[in-house]
Amino acid sequence: MPITKATQTDVPELSRLINSAYRGESSKKGWTTEAHLLDGLRIDESTLNGYFEDPNIIILKNTDETGQITGSVYLEVRGPKLYVGMFSVSPLLQGKGLGRELLAAAATYAKQLGCHTLTMTVISIRHELISWYERRGFKATGETQPFHVHEKFGAAKQPIQLIVLEKGV
């Protein structure tokens, strides 16, 4: 199915998808889980609703033939760069190419918005995930950022640091 812009009516389903891809038992069915690193939710509906009120933020979604959202990606214009975050694919569909399609759609949006670079942060000890992004042309910039945990979204089970990855479009 085509990748399109999500709308506020998608918030409940987006919240379920994103949390199932990152946290809790359901996330362990896929390879992108953070459940071993962080407790709690990845996102809540209130925060997602706020994103739709920001003109610099776009959330793309992929739907299956029944209309169910199976993948999503958060995009935020940050000057000449497009930040890619909350990249989510249903744990049951990971490894089938949907992630590559979502990244390609993000690159297309970057060009349309006049951005020349995709940028993202990844937990530094997620080596398999970093390798996946590197195979898709992303490179570590050498920059690191602290991981800020919000009590609303659980606690880190160990110290966490983020690395910045970028790719020209």
Please state what every model-predicted region is.
Residues P2-R16, R23-G24:
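A short beta-loop-alpha structural element at the N-terminal edge
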Residues N19-L48:
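Conserved GNAT-fold acetyl-CoA-binding loop/helix
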Residues I43-L60, Y83, Q158-Q161:
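A short helix-loop-beta-strand connector motif used in the catalytic cores of GNAT acetyltransferases and
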Residues K61, Q68-E76, Y83-S88:
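Conserved beta-strand in the GNAT
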Residues P80-P91, R100, T121:
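Conserved acetyl-CoA binding element of GNAT-fold acetyltransferases
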Residues V89, G95-T108, R135:
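Conserved acetyl-CoA-binding loop-helix of GNAT-fold acetyltransferases
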Residues A110-V122:
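Conserved GNAT acetyl-CoA-binding A-motif
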Residues T119-I123, I130, E134-A156:
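Conserved catalytic-core motifs of GNAT/GCN5-like acyltransferases
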